[in-house]
Regions:
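Long, compositionally biased charged/polar stretches
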Residues: 1-615
Length: 615
């Protein structure tokens, strides 16, 4: 009994407010009270009301919302609700929402303390969490885009996605406007150059966008140099391919009379472009004629382009994050501490992935139009790559050890990935230890075990044989698994995404397609190179897509800088504060190192790492 102060926060994005009236109920452990005053939410505003409650409520458990509409349902984006009372000395309660409120049903928001099933011995939240998961499983259904690939969210269009998974209006408008700009520029360039000759490497300058990236301009000027060619495999757009070789690859076949080259392999780089069913091709050497050696390197870079975009970027970044997202929404209620920890790192993933499936890798999409592996090859490559989705490969300490890159001083990706992993692991451990006091508490959490099994057995199609756990037995194992999930959705995706504009804008450095077969002789000329590299339209489309995906987004949220507060209480806030402190220290260290480098490596700079797979 007494006076309660209630503050309601509405989102700041376009259309977040509502013309509909909203009624509230306070639900306590001992009673429930309807708030007579109705509010009309205003975009970007906090609305405060006071209510004199006659009933004794006890500690508050829920706030219930009911949005009334007469003619039109006007959706409302609610950030949170704060309640203080009874009286000026009463307790404060925070009820996170961060979702759209639509329709005429009643929405119940639990108080923001993270609670496992074991934290609710009286079962006060049991019915709520069961009903929430039941509703979510109807909304979030597994789909199968292509046989043999890890599963995805069911749905063919944006409208098939739950409203809370779609872009907010601000991001949607910017994304679609920038896409339209890129396609318009492509059309203009195509029309202006339709009759011009395309017979010299300098002609690629016609479609190169200056002023977008200093590194891209350096690549344009220096791409023929062997040092830059090799550097890219350590710290370029795709740092996931390189591994230390302790013996010659079995696929490296020496043509008759060239066996003596084996002893020279330790001294200089050599390339071989094998063709299935054909006799061994020649080994291409830096001492070959310039155009011969350049063409061989272009083939290697084009192959890396395919592996990067499909395996490292799409599969290991986007699609893996989608599995984590769908499993989380199906298995963890919003009151669960693991849900609260991971949900900021799943924002926008389902829509950006759906756009990729319907625009980039769909039938007659970008890959089919201009990429070598289009027309079905990209699907086969993804299917084959699925066999390499091992648990260790998603964890940098294990992956870098397996690839022999630990301690390689020139691998800035390795250095930064390890430090970022360790920072995230400490952050995760802080939250885990707040909510799980023993290993037994982890083992007994049925919702947590269901979530882990859903990822490994369902989304990843039974990945136990590749090292993924299908149950979690200890706090350390939970910490490691959660760190893998968050690092995949943040740092790992960033390392595969941010380099596209820098390294792929100059098309000859990373051709999306090669129009002639791999060379079998050493008589290549400039004409051969130009006939093999992408034509004008293909190169223009590559440049346009690279800009669309690679340029910095104005509403980007940096790692750990999300404004949403899903947790209540001082403990989680202190853990997040420590994360931000450690990220700031890493930021300073990377900038200090980069100041001494000819080519700075900033793809894991915390201020540039997106908080989720959102682009």
């Amino acid at each position: 009994m007494g006076l309660y102060r209630i503050r309601v926060s509405t989102g700041s994005s376009l259309c977040a407010g509502s013309n509909n009236q909203v009624q509230l109920w306070l639900v306590g452990q001992h009673g429930e009270a309807a708030i007579r005053t109705r509010l009309r939410p205003t975009r970007g505003q906090e609305t405060e009301i006071k209510a004199d409650v006659q009933e004794y409520l006890g500690p508050l458990l829920f706030v219930k919302l009911h949005k009334r509409h007469f003619f039109q349902d006007d959706a409302w984006f609610c950030n949170w609700i704060w309640v203080q009372g009874p009286g000026p000395s009463g307790d404060e309660f925070r009820f996170p929402c961060y979702r759209w409120v639509e329709g005429s049903g009643i929405l119940s928001l639990p108080e923001g303390t993270g609670r496992t099933l074991g934290d609710d011995p009286q079962g006060l939240f049991k019915q709520h969490r069961e009903q929430e998961l039941k509703d979510r499983r109807r909304l979030y259904r597994w789909g199968n885009w292509k046989d043999g690939l890890i599963l995805n969210m069911a749905g063919a269009t944006i409208s098939d996605l739950p409203i809370d998974e779609r872009f907010l209006e601000d991001k949607k408008i910017y994304f679609e406007a920038s896409l339209a700009k890129g396609l318009a520029d492509l059309a203009i360039k195509d029309s202006l150059n339709v009759l011009t000759c395309w017979n010299d490497l300098d002609d690629f300058n016609r479609i190169f966008w200056c002023g977008q990236s200093k590194l891209a301009e350096k690549v344009r000027d220096s791409w023929k140099e062997d040092a830059l060619f090799g550097y890219q495999f350590l710290n370029g757009a795709n740092p996931m391919l390189l591994r230390r070789s302790k013996q010659l690859p079995a696929r490296l076949v020496f043509p008759p009379g060239m066996e003596e080259l084996k002893v020279q392999l330790e001294k200089e780089l050599q390339l071989q472009l094998p063709r299935v069913g054909s006799s061994p091709p020649p080994l291409f050497l830096p001492t070959d004629p310039p155009m011969v050696w350049l063409l061989a390197k272009c083939w290697v870079r084009s192959a890396d382009f395919q592996m990067h975009e499909l395996q490292s970027h799409l599969l290991r970044g986007h699609l893996m994050a989608e599995v984590i997202t769908v499993a989380t929404m199906r298995c963890l209620p919003s009151i669960h501490p693991v849900f609260k920890l991971i949900i900021p790192h799943l924002r926008y993933t389902l829509e950006i992935n759906l756009r990729a499936r319907t625009g980039l890798v769909s039938d007659m999409g970008v890959f089919d139009q201009v990429v070598s592996t289009g027309g079905g090859g990209h699907v086969e490559l993804l299917q084959r790559a699925g066999a390499f989705l091992t648990y260790r490969s998603f964890c940098p300490p294990d992956d870098l050890a397996d690839r022999g890159l630990l301690g390689v001083k020139s691998s800035f990706y390795a250095q930064d990935a390890l430090r970022l992993w360790e920072i995230l692991a400490r952050y995760v451990q802080g939250i885990v230890h707040l909510h799980y006091k023993t290993d037994e508490a982890v083992r007994d959490d049925l919702e947590l075990q269901s979530w882990c099994a859903e990822i490994t057995e369902v989304g990843l199609l039974g990945a136990q044989d590749r090292g993924f756990p299908n149950s979690l037995q200890s706090r350390d194992q939970l910490r490691h698994f959660l760190t893998m999930c968050i690092f995949t959705c943040t740092g790992q995706h960033s390392s595969a995404h941010l380099g596209q504009l820098d390294w792929y804008s100059w098309v000859p450095n990373a051709p999306c397609t090669m129009r002639m077969p791999p060379p079998t002789t050493k008589d290549a000329t400039l004409g051969t190179v130009m006939a093999t590299l992408p034509n004008f339209h293909q190169a223009s489309l590559q440049m346009s897509i690279v800009w669309q995906l690679g340029h910095r987004q104005p509403m980007m949220v940096a790692l750990g800088q999300h404004q949403e507060e899903y947790f209540s209480g001082p403990g989680p806030k202190a853990v997040l504060k420590e994360l931000r402190k450690e990220l700031d220290a890493l930021e300073k260290d990377i900038k200090t190192r980069n100041a001494k480098l000819d080519i700075p490596y900033d793809y894991l700079l915390p201020s540039l790492v997106e908080n989720s797979v959102a682009i």
